[in-house]
Amino acid sequence: MLASKHTPWRRLQGISFGMYSAEELKKLSVKSITNPRYVDSLGNPSADGLYDLALGPADSKEVCSTCVQDFNNCSGHLGHIDLPLTVYNPLLFDKLYLLLRGSCLNCHMLTCPRAAIHLLVCQLKVLDVGALQAVYELERILSRFLEETSDPSAFEIQEELEEYTSKILQNNLLGSQGAHVKNVCESRSKLVAHFWKTHMAAKRCPHCKTGRSVVRKEHNSKLTITYPAMVHKKSGQKDAELPEGAPAAPGIDEAQMGKRGYLTPSSAQEHLFAIWKNEGFFLNYLFSGLDDIGPESSFNPSMFFLDFIVVPPSRYRPINRLGDQMFTNGQTVNLQAVMKDAVLIRKLLAVMAQEQKLPCEMTEITIDKENDSSGAIDRSFLSLLPGQSLTDKLYNIWIRLQSHVNIVFDSDMDKLMLEKYPGIRQILEKKEGLFRKHMMGKRVDYAARSVICPDMYINTNEIGIPMVFATKLTYPQPVTPWNVQELRQAVINGPNVHPGASMVINEDGSRTALSAVDATQREAVAKQLLTPSTGIPKPQGAKVVCRHVKNGDILLLNRQPTLHRPSIQAHRAHILPEEKVLRLHYANCKAYNADFDGDEMNAHFPQSELGRAEAYVLACTDQQYLVPKDGQPLAGLIQDHMVSGANMTIRGCFFTREQYMELVYRGLTDKVGRVKLFPPAILKPFPLWTGKQVVSTLLINIIPEDYTPLNLTGKAKIGSKAWVKEKPRPVPDFDPDSMCESQVIIREGELLCGVLDKAHYGSSAYGLVHCCYEIYGGETSGRVLTCLARLFTAYLQLYRGFTLGVEDILVKPNADVMRQRIIEESTQCGPRAVRAALNLPEAASCDEIQGKWQDAIWRKDQRDFNMIDMKFKEEVNHYSNEINKACMPFGLHRQFPENNLQMMVQSGAKGSTVNTMQISCLLGQIELEGRRPPLMASGKSLPCFEPYEFTPRAGGFVTGRFLTGIRPPEFFFHCMAGREGLVDTAVKTSRSGYLQRCIIKHLEGLVIQYDLTVRDSDGSVVQFLYGEDGLDIPKTQFLQPKQFPFLASNYEVIMKSKHLHEVLSRADPQKVLRHFRAIKKWHHRHSSALLRKGAFLSFSQKIQAAVKALNLEGKTQNGRSPETQQMLQMWHELDEQSRRKYQKRAAPCPDPSLSVWRPDIHFASVSETFEKKIDDYSQEWAAQAEKSHNRSELSLDRLRTLLQLKWQRSLCDPGEAVGLLAAQSIGEPSTQMTLNTFHFAGRGEMNVTLGIPRLREILMVASANIKTPMMSVPVFNTKKALRRVKSLKKQLTRVCLGEVLQKVDIQESFCMGEKQNKFRVYELRFQFLPHAYYQQEKCLRPEDILHFMETRFFKLLMEAIKKKNSKASAFRSVNTRRATQKDLDDTEDSGRNRREEERDEEEEGNIVDAEAEEGDADASDTKRKEKQEEEVDYESEEEGEEEEEEDVQEEENIKGEGAHQTHEPDEEEGSGLEEESSQNPPCRHSRPQGAEAMERRIQAVRESHSFIEDYQYDTEESLWCQVTVKLPLMKINFDMSSLVVSLAHNAIVYTTKGITRCLLNETINSKNEKEFVLNTEGINLPELFKYSEVLDLRRLYSNDIHAVANTYGIEAALRVIEKEIKDVFAVYGIAVDPRHLSLVADYMCFEGVYKPLNRFGIQSSSSPLQQMTFETSFQFLKQATMMGSHDELKSPSACLVVGKVVKGGTGLFELKQPLR
């Protein structure tokens, strides 16, 4: 079929990453580029320029001078630019810096311990063969060896480790296969990272004892070095180590000691070569990707430096011509800058050489500029170069060359340049980069895009194609004798007449385009279709005709955003001649999330038979009826069809013969064959058919001929109460639902009772269409939808019509009067709400209430304000409900079903009861972000209200309705709410989009294999059975006990469609059933015992008394008494039979059936829960069968086997890409979540993070410090526990000073000391609340507070004052001293490491002082920053993170100093606050014993700080204290009172570590009993363990996943992840199947630790291409190159990059062709 040159005959197996060496590149290069001008004055490429023709032609007019081919055939050739001086390789600059920092510049050895080096080498060797366990074994061997031998030599250590390693390498069977697995990759990168982090920062060299040289990097372009102050030389030893004839690398000169200088690349290179001689064996393993591909492949240190730069071929950086202007490519500009620098350096070196008559070598010689002996050389350029002497100029331009070379690689490396052109990194990265734009997704042919419009006359699985598309989209059809007639006609019709053809492909692959105008040419081609072309030696297959799309061809349709699998489905084409747009059936709208307000959709036309087959069978719309998220139906009829269907099937709707026939015909237009009809329901006076009969006629004609029609008992959406006009008469045993219109009964395909509405043909579960899908398959259910749509449309068009009028929304006069009265009442409820919220007395005056409310609003702690908000909402909700009761539904002028608006709402067509209430009753309370509208600074909510007005109207309670209009202020509130919705939508798309992308990139490789395990693309098992039971979510819908009766009533059909008899004849369920019986038997036997006893334990209990009676003498050995020894001996001497008796009794419960018998090959091996469901149902069924009179033919066993078969048929198919489905099922609903469902806690509630922020916290960040950590523990239901839990709650609650402080009086005065010193004196008097005020809630006494003031608070206050004054010179010296101590560059390193650990809090702005209440400056700044960040779209968000990462990496020490200065006092304060945070309250101080003790206390406070002059306190009650503070007079003044107040709010008098607040809430548990639950804000699990008699610790729960993992292990954390994600969605009423959540959780915890789904989590992936196509491609590329990684091309991303078929779905297997 395909011409030979198109048939692929080779396949990529893998990709390895590495670096070309300088020699290889020199060989590859065809030209040295020396001319900085790339085009001459005529616009032609200049010789030796960057567009020289030797590099290949830059555009189509030229010819390559190397291979003499034109633009289309020449793939381009590399060139190079020679650099006059060596520069650092920007790719490896950071690693070079670490190498230099971790090595000794004197003896050229690494400064890490030798043991670490040999250990790492051996560990990397064993990892290369995938021996993970050996890594830990080696660590053990080393530590044991170091313990046993004192001061071992490096050689001994090496021998010891090598011995074990060689054993492992010999016994290895896998070869290098095992090395490309996630766990091994993770282990390797961990070991290497750990080595760099811990061993490369020694203070002095262990070999020559020289102090460490401090190396620092600046602007990524130069290294500066501070040499150590003294050097230890060991004479004679140094040269002995070097091999013969090797030049000794220079050590450190005497002159350089203690100096700081610039380390040039050439001296760095010398040093590196010297290290390499000493440490080469080790560096080979550390940089395995930098091997020289030579005879002996080994690490090549010259890789760290560049002597020339490679120039890519011209075609990859084309010149863009616009008119007569030329615009060059950014890459070319960057290369040009390097060349200009090179020219300048060469000139400068010539000048220096002439002046000095020296070789161009770097020595610190200042050159006297006066002796102007160089007459020949042009020196005018020197004035352009910065620097004094020539050497300075040389260094400066050398650094400039370095930064220009950097820019070629990465334009962000130079932070100082303003005009930037993209470097290599910019070309690869981000959404617009090569990986994501051109490799992961490509533009395609044979696709169409147009606006969609609705059409309910085509089938649900069809798509209407306009003629414009039909003549352009073609399919390559091979010509055969049986289709030649059709194809001839197509060729004759030509490209413009449908059905025609556009082109014919001959046997040799040449193409003949069919002319639109020349009919004779087309006829000639048509006649030769079957005759082989002349001149071809052997005919290679047949001709191929590219024919137009025709009816019935399959197309893939897609609407963006493609959030989940149903966003791409296959439809059959239906050509519509007169149209210009795509036409889509209404039923598919929900799957695509499409509406017809201008949406566009894409259509793709598959070009191979394989693709078409997949589309027809798997991707077809009929097969996509259920959504993978939770198995709910997607397709369903909408709006008009609901109203029409409900009206048509209502009792009393009759049709004459003509009408009946017309409707049946309209419903079944495309049925072939006889139509079965029903006899009329009414015969006299003339025959009439009911609407129900019309629907039944459709059903029995659609259901396939050879299947029994279905039986179904269900409910309609319209409830039974809606039909009741007046109270029914009392009848004994009256069941209101029985035979009512809300009960739908279908027997043998005939609708006998009930109205069909949204519940049956909308997108709702267990309706008529869903049941048809389940029993007869997708094709039938699709036809049911199609036919019903046509029928209902016809009914509306021909007989009924549908309209709304004002009459439908009018309210009766008496209801209106009631409504008015309630509205008047509601205006008075304001003061009542505020009083209730703030616990004010009834008698409080309005002014007092207003004052309190005003305070609550402007207080930093918003809890009171939230409380008032809640009370207001409760009040107005009460009034809203009253009004709604008065008006709806009996207050309406017309009632259901005559009321068309009610009909529309009830049947589910459109709208909700809320809409009808807004029209007829009132709009209700307007809420913004979960609160009432905020107040302006003036205290008004809108300018037309009074400040702090109480009326609900002023708080956004709208009493108007749309029927009678709303007032301007109410309209304004209404608009505010509308705007909020829009803003939310705009913001959340990007956030959830990025979240979904992260999950998809991680989980893309998870596929079900043929052994039913879920594995990642590298073969690592993530789950042994998908979702823990192996079931496919859409198939599980009818495996619920509620649906068993439906399956039983349709037994015949299901048995036939599932081939039950065949299965039973081949499968034997007995083995499995025996297993289930064994499990039941065990449970029956061990029902009472909670603890399982071992065999020896039961034996020893039995003989214990007998042994004790022996009174054995002797002493305890190894912790075992003589009695125990005797028992052990008796147990060992016991004969086999007796021992087996004990062992049998103590045998553990057999494993569950699923884990023993693989469910797909063992019939009846089902999950335990399902087995239990079947048992329960069987008993129920048997009981019912006894009661009922008519015996059912269905026996219990047959029902059981049917259910088991149904379960087995529901197993997930191998090849299912469950990872992608899980990712889509979490990502797609997250777009529907409003960004933050705001949940503002009042005083009695917990604050919780919800919505997308919480999802990001769990999935993307996996941060150890979550925003709202909490624990909850149920309290035992005993009197003692309930009494003690009250005091426990008090004990766990944190107390701040502000909560117990009544007031602070401050007096300020001046005083003059001697020597004219001026002072400012403050007298601060602190008055505390009396104990009675807080003893109920707080675990404190006044003495404790006073003790806190004396020991901690005054110190904090002085620190804060010092901080305020730090601008003035008096204290500057203190701070600078602190900073310089920490100035050493290892703090930069530890700082960076700390920062990297904290990086996972990218979005949790790090507030330094952990104790700060909700509003210190840092907190508000970070909040503001977060607000700004939230508005960025997700692409730029990703960029921001990358830049941040870069900044962190390049953090210079200067920054570190600044950070230390600002953070230090805070850190100190934080640590100080913690000191007091013991569980027990601070030591209780008894009343002072006399004057002496009192004097001591006062003295201690005075001496605690130089500023404190005097101190006094209340010796009687401990209710006040007074301190006098004397400060030197400053130019700057600050407000002491605000400082004291803010400190008092943040100073913690008493706390339990980690817990801020405690609440006791009453809940209902699973057994429907009331119980108390203790909830804490903050986490401290060990603390709660102390109260095991009060709290039921077995049911303790915490939302901090890390805390649970660290305390209870990773399996517990797994469950927490599942529960947390489920809870986030539950708030919005979204159900996601637990199988998806378990898969995501299993993946995140795969490595035994909880890892996030972000770029730090993907570092352990074994596929470098998967990492690169995710984020920070350059970073991952660098990593892969240095480590010499290999990609097996198994992950989906890697397959897409190289164009392989992804190993999933139908790509999981390959078919062998039988050749005979």
UniProtKB/Swiss-Prot annotation:
Principal cellular location given in the protein's record: nucleus
GO BP term, example: negative regulation of protein localization to nucleolus
Name of one Pfam family that matches: RNA_pol_Rpb1_4
Ranges where the record places region Rudder: 410-423
Region (Involved in RRN3 binding to Pol I complex): 475-549
Catalytic activity, EC: 2.7.7.6
Known catalytic reactions: RNA(n) + a ribonucleoside 5'-triphosphate = RNA(n+1) + diphosphate
Cofactor(s) the protein needs: Mg(2+)
SUPFAM superfamilies: beta and beta-prime subunits of DNA dependent RNA-polymerase (SSF64484)
Region (Bridging helix): 967-1008
Binding-site positions, DNA nontemplate strand: R436
PTM comment text: Phosphorylated.
Keyword Cytoplasm included in the entry's annotation: no
Region (Funnel): 812-890
Binding site residues for Mg(2+) 1: D595, D597, D599
Residues at the site labelled NTP recognition and base pairing: P561, G805
Binding of Mg(2+) 2, residues: D595, D597
Residues binding Zn(2+) 2: C104, C107, C205, C208
Membrane-spanning parts: none
Keyword Metal-binding annotated: yes
Cofactor: binding comment: Two Mg(2+) ions are coordinated by both the catalytic residues and the nucleic acid substrate to enhance substrate recognition and catalytic efficiency.
UniProt region (Disordered), positions on chain: 1368-1493
Function statement: Catalytic core component of RNA polymerase I (Pol I), a DNA-dependent RNA polymerase which synthesizes ribosomal RNA precursors using the four ribonucleoside triphosphates as substrates. Transcribes 47S pre-rRNAs from multicopy rRNA gene clusters, giving rise to 5.8S, 18S and 28S ribosomal RNAs. Pol I-mediated transcription cycle proceeds through transcription initiation, transcription elongation and transcription termination stages.
Notes concerning its domains: The clamps form the DNA-binding cleft. The bridging helix crosses the cleft near the catalytic site and is thought to promote polymerase translocation by acting as a ratchet that moves the DNA-RNA hybrid through the active site.
Assembly, per entry: Component of the RNA polymerase I (Pol I) complex consisting of 13 subunits: a ten-subunit catalytic core composed of POLR1A/RPA1, POLR1B/RPA2, POLR1C/RPAC1, POLR1D/RPAC2, POLR1H/RPA12, POLR2E/RPABC1, POLR2F/RPABC2, POLR2H/RPABC3, POLR2K/RPABC4 and POLR2L/RPABC5; a mobile stalk subunit POLR1F/RPA43 protruding from the core and additional subunits homologous to general transcription factors POLR1E/RPA49 and POLR1G/RPA34. Part of Pol I pre-initiation complex (PIC), in which Pol I core assembles with RRN3 and promoter-bound UTBF and SL1/TIF-IB complex.
Protein name in UniProt: DNA-directed RNA polymerase I subunit RPA1
Taxonomic source organism: Rattus norvegicus (Rat)
